[in-house]
Amino acid sequence: MSKRPFAEPFRRALEICQPYIVAPRSHWDDLDCRPLGVAVPAALRIDPTRLASERFLTWIEQLDAQTFGPQAMAMPRWVFYDCCEWPSALFGLATRPANISAQLRETFGVGPGDRVWVPITLHVAIPTVHPGEFFEHNVGSLGEQIGVQGLGTFTKALGCRVLRARTLVGAAQWTGRALGMHLRFGPLDVLTAYTPAHSYPRTLTYRHATDVETLQRVARGDEPSSPDAAFRVKLDDDGLRRLQRRIERGDTQYSLAGRPIERRNGLFAPIAARTLTP
């Protein structure tokens, strides 16, 4: 186990990045503005109710379009405000324009010498009715712009701490790239395996812990523990519907025990099972 607080790539990122928070000023005292010891400077505590925040919020919208636009899942600007910036807090890392590509500077409308901070990652989680539980709405990263892999994972760990979240629930596509990032936080409780309520029914609803020890481990880059798989589920409609029916019986907790595995006859996910006490 590493003795250092952050993995080497994350330490390098913090040499040229600063954390930011977007939330109304009246909410700041309820947030952890030093997540895992990384202080959010006063200049990057952005109040979305102020005219002065307009340019930075435009950059966040453009960042989201860069990461989710190709999947037709980019958020309209009003969704950021209604679902993220007012009821919760948006967190991420920002860097100077000189550290990003000329193409991205053109997208953001900044010059290489501009003394501004432009966002390159973001994390959004929305509080649920259960105290301490948040629903993960968005994790976006352009970490490749500064040559850092896994910066979305680091941003998520810090963002969960900003919100003081105890547990995190979210939705992800079984074949999506983000699934590997979520598994860095440990085995994922599978709350739904096939989700007709979502635009993409082959979506799982997952849950994992976000206690300080878990977030510190992720930030160090240490591997999570993984339970043994009881069986593997084929990631097609029939396989996922069968698992969904088992979930709905309510007598067993199923968890995703690792990344899906490609076989000759399709893609399969390892599933752990734990009988629930009546």
Feature map (PLM): residue ranges:
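Conserved active-site alpha-helix within GNAT-family acetyltransferase domains
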Residues: 164, 174-196
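Conserved beta-strand-loop-alpha-helix junction that forms the acyl-donor binding cleft
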Residues: 169-180, 234-237
